[in-house]
Amino acid sequence: MKLRLGALLLAGLLLAGCDQSGSDAKHIKVGVINGAEQDVAEVAKKVAKEKFGLDVELVGFSGSLLPNDATNHGELDANVFQHRPFLAEDNKAHGYKLVAVGNTFVFPMAGYSRKIKSVAELKDGATIAIPNDPTNLGRALLLLQNEKLIALKPDVGLLPTALDITANPKKLNIMELEGAQLPRVLDDPKVDVAIISTTYLQQTGLSPVHDSVFIEDKNSPYVNIVVTREDNKDAENVKEFIQSYQSPEVAKAAETIFNGGAVPGWE
């Protein structure tokens, strides 16, 4: 009797395991940044359900510090918030085994101001707020160099820091802040310009195309990506999510949500 009961329990566990596996194949947990990017991901979620029967569970984050850690430790199946230079730096810094498995959008970084309309109006000693994470900090410095506001060491690559500045003719004060804080400092009387990723613009009502003082050009290497663990890159639910994200429905929604500030990176 005990043997029979044990066999029945084992069979039940095996069946439960099979059911769970089947359920997971049609379920994916994806990390996104709260706000506009999550709004876009909601459209991908709808497409995934309609086209593939895939249930997408979106997990919102307020900043860029936690999604990769959660993905690396299996708390998320994938995330959608970063570009390749950011991923490379995070993998190197934390020993993550994360890989890019698909492109999403290029979100141009640009300089915004409530005080000036052009670079020519920027006064000596002005304060410019930039992101403080290594890759977007470097991206902002390269943008400032492109506007001839600073000069950087030759061959500095994509990850310059303030220590790589070799010339600062206007003696600009460069303030490093968490990316999510940058839209709020536009109203700070001490800040003249904030360099902000399109990701964090929704709350401001600003358009990178129409409202920026200066902006990255179309050749930016910073296309955003879908990221997962190396051992999960061939999972069917990941492939179906990518196909759902890279859809006309998502591209159209992003065009509206980001007011023209999201360029599809898969076309």
Where are these regions (language model features)?
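Short helix-initiation/N-cap motifs at beta->coil->alpha
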Residues: 58-69, 156-184
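A conserved helix-loop-strand patch within extracytoplasmic ligand-binding domains
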Residues: 101-151, 251
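C-terminal motif of bacterial Sec signal peptides marking the signal peptidase cleavage site
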Residues: 14-17
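Short, polar/charged alpha-helical segment
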Residues: 27, 34-59, 66, 70-72
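Periplasmic-binding protein-like
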Residues: 102-113, 138-145, 202-267
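Beta->alpha turn/N-cap motifs
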Residues: 35, 62-64, 74, 78-88, ...
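Pocket-flanking alpha-helical
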Residues: 64-95, 110-112, 117, 140, ...
